[in-house]
Amino acid sequence: MTTSSSQVHSLAVPNRRLPRISLGMLLVLPALTAILLLYALPLARSLVTAFRDSSGAWTTDHVVRAFSLYGRDMLFSVGVVSVSLALIAAISIAISGYLVLGATPWAVRLLRWLYRWPLFIPFVVTGQIARSFLATNGMMNNVLVETGLMASSSAQSFLDWRGLVLTFAWKQVPFVTLLLAGAMAAVDRSHIEAARNAGANRLRCLFEIVLPQAAPSLWVGLILSLVAMLSVLSVPMMLISGNPTMMTAMMAHRITYYGDYGIANALGLFSYALTAVTAWVYLRLTLRREATA
């Protein structure tokens, strides 16, 4: 009798859990639908289109032509993104370190208030600001000429790779700093105080105590910045008029003027691969750090 009652109870438990599971699926369904329709489906279509010709046959011609026609643009994109990430990392570490270890309260409050402003400015507005600021007769050169720091004949345009690097850094530094400063603020203050009592200065505390513990947040911010810089179209379209340029501008050019989705998706495939490799390296480093911890 006891055995039969326990069997009946064990069979009744899943039936009681079914409504709860169904309710959970209903709550998650809108998010899953958005991911499938807005990310997974376009990704699958772009991958298929990159390897199929107009007749529907499988081919690698689109990838080969993309590398032959836009190889310089691919290298240019990788170079600009790499320099931008290095600049973003350096500035973000400096700002975050001062926010956490700074000894002047009013300067810390002022910096905390100022550095976040570019977060609320869209990329298209950022591109227009940079175009007006970095041009030959832009605000930067006019200020340098008026203050006597540069002759008017020496003014030059920064609407090239340098302008792209400065614009990307100006836009993404606040985002990375926000993540990194939060991670640094979560570090146990006793570690910092122990290092200071042992004679370490603030710079050494930053690079040997605080930054190693906050490094995962820095990597996350840089990877997300990489994705943002590889996907933005407005900034390279506004700042660079010739070649080479960013891959997003070439993809838009290929679709707008030629209707060639095959080569455009092949260029997008290279962006996917670059982002995936970067994310894979981050995951490997994270797993190795957790294994040795």
Regions found by a protein language model. Give the residues of each.
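Short, Lys/Arg-rich, polar N-terminal cytosolic tail immediately upstream
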Residues: 1-20
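Glycine/proline-centered hinge or cleavage motifs at structural transition points of membrane proteins
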Residues: 198-200, 212
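Membrane-water interface segments at the C-terminal ends of transmembrane alpha-helices
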Residues: 20-52, 69-153, 159-185, 213, ...
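Short glycine/proline-centered loop/turn elements that form peptide/ligand docking sites
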Residues: 187-191, 290-291
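Short cytosolic juxtamembrane segments of multi-pass membrane proteins
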Residues: 285-293
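Glycine-rich helix-loop "coupling/hinge" segments at transmembrane-helix boundaries
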Residues: 52-56, 233-261
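A short amphipathic helical element positioned immediately N-terminal to and/or at the very start
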Residues: 58-67
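Short alpha-helical segment that forms part of, or immediately flanks, the ligand-binding pocket
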Residues: 115, 192-193
